[in-house]
């Protein structure tokens, strides 16, 4: 049985609910992978039988905790993200089996380096150009991540698993687009 963080009672009801939902999932044998940035191929996480959870900074609340480890002039998004990890106040980070990030900026690279001391953190190398070499590099990164998931969870991810996950994520994207289209209505 997993424990809740020591500071659980000080959380808002919404944050407590998030913790309880994640704890229930983990207590039932569920797998959770925390992700930073939309470049992480969540389809592979789903194909591995895990739930991808988006991690980010939702408030300035934990920035002061992060500034004990990061420069104060660093991006507030990075400081808040790292602060949530340090303070055990994000249910999705707390219950993630491991974290996946990417190299969109130097600040995130440093954050992931430090974050690896808190929880295993896998960093995907994001190409910085849009040519054939970059595409080849990204394809290799995706295959390395595929292998990481298989090794970490002791599973085999098949092409069929990936195809099913792609269909699921595409259906989700279509629904989000439909929702956003509602904003055009009078």
Where are these regions (language model features)?
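An N-terminal assembly and electron-transfer interface module characteristic of large anaerobic redox
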Residues: 1-186
